Design a protein with these regions (language model features):
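Conserved aromatic-histidine-acidic binding/catalytic patches
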Residues: 10-13, 84-88, 124
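Surface-exposed, flexible loop/turn segments at secondary-structure boundaries
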Residues: 12, 43, 184
């Protein structure tokens, strides 16, 4: 079975701009292509940031470009969130995604998209458990099962391993590859339209 590997980061605005596309690809191809999500660890460890006024200015410039290129909406609640000087740590939302890959793998793509929407449209803080519990409830995932794995040492270790694996494939987000019979083909680096992505996948299928 072909595999689509998606390297992203939950705090990457361009990845949010790409979220409708990855969800559409998943809905179309989930029965014939395996999807693997690899959060890349953009801001982790020593690179964890604070949502300072300088960072917010940087975000707003990029968000405008994302909206223009992708047509996605950034919510008013997100703009309110930008007024808070919260910590920006990619490890936490990445660990939430890794958790779902382990406890409900078939829901990883919808969960990942919902995590991005939680920040960029609904203005939710990705540092808080309640943000993920709300998504888990919406997707029918048992909340206690999620919490137990999410806070486990295994999840933390596996998230670090995922970062290391992601960097072998890409250093920029989003990047999309297709693996077919041991051969890897990059079909997206940055942003591509859904029609272009579908065409590239169809070529590789045939």
């Amino acid at each position: 079975m072909m595999k689509l590997i998606y390297i992203m980061d939950p705090l990457c605005g361009w990845c949010y701009g790409n979220s409708d596309n990855i969800l559409e690809l998943f809905e179309k191809y989930k029965n014939e292509i395996k999807f693997e999500i690899l959060p890349g660890g953009m801001w982790v460890g020593e690179n964890v940031r604070r949502q300072s006024p300088q960072m917010v200015s940087f975000f707003l410039r990029h968000d405008t470009a994302v909206e223009e290129h992708t047509g996605i909406d950034f919510g008013n609640a997100y703009r309110e969130l930008l007024k808070q000087e919260i910590v920006l740590d990619s490890e936490i939302p990445s660990r939430a995604i890794v958790t779902i890959q382990n406890i409900a793998p078939e829901l990883t793509v919808p969960f990942m998209v919902a995590v991005q929407k939680a920040r960029y449209y609904l203005g939710k803080d990705l540092n808080l458990d309640e943000t993920y519990l709300s998504i888990a409830e919406d997707l029918g995932i048992d909340e206690q099962t999620f919490l137990d794995y999410f806070h486990s040492d295994k999840a933390k270790k596996e998230t670090q391993n995922t970062f290391q694996k992601a960097v072998q494939f890409a250093q920029s987000f989003p990047t999309m590859l297709v693996e077919n019979n041991g051969e890897y083909t990059v079909i997206e680096q940055g942003y591509a339209s859904i029609s272009d992505l579908e065409k590239r996948i169809e070529v590789l299928k045939n």
